[in-house]
Amino acid sequence: SLRLALICPGLLPIRNICVATSRSRGVFRKYKLSRIMLRDMGLQGLLPGFKKR
């Protein structure tokens, strides 16, 4: 579908989807992760710069 989106840009809407879980709601665009995965990976120390407040 990415190839089709490049050929006809107005044909398919670009959805923000989590790359880990394919969840479409609560996705942070900068990280392409859902809020749940962002929290889990941050607590595990997999994301540099994330810390618990």
Swiss-Prot record:
S-S bonds: none
Record keywords: Mitochondrion, Ribonucleoprotein, Ribosomal protein
Source species, domain of life: Eukaryota
One of the GO biological process terms: translation
Protein name as catalogued: Small ribosomal subunit protein uS14m
Subcellular location: Mitochondrion
Sample GO molecular function, one term: structural constituent of ribosome
Pfam families: Ribosomal_S14
Family assignment from sequence similarity: Belongs to the universal ribosomal protein uS14 family.
Annotated GO CC locations: mitochondrion; ribonucleoprotein complex; ribosome
Keyword ATP-binding: no
Keyword Ribonucleoprotein among record annotations: yes
